[in-house]
Amino acid sequence: XXKEIXWIFHDN
């Protein structure tokens, strides 16, 4: 997982 712009939608 990671904290990015789209973290609300998916955790990469």
UniProtKB/Swiss-Prot annotation:
Keywords recorded for this protein, A-Z: Antibiotic, Antimicrobial, Bacteriocin, Secreted
Highest taxon above the source species: Bacteria
The UniProt record lists the keyword Secreted: yes
Subcellular location: Secreted
pH dependence of function: Active from pH 2.0 to 8.0. Retains some activity up to pH 12.0.
One GO CC annotation: extracellular region
Signal peptide location: none
Reported temperature dependence: Active from 20 to 100 degrees Celsius.
Listed GO biological process terms: defense response to bacterium; killing of cells of another organism
Quaternary structure and partners: Monomer.
Function of the protein: Has antibacterial activity against Gram-positive and Gram-negative bacteria including Salmonella, B.cereus, B.megaterium, L.casei, L.viridescens, M.flavus, C.glutamicum, C.crenatum, L.mesenteroides and E.faecalis.
Official protein name in the record: Subpeptin JM4-A
Phylogenetic placement of the source organism: Bacteria, Bacillati, Bacillota, Bacilli, Bacillales
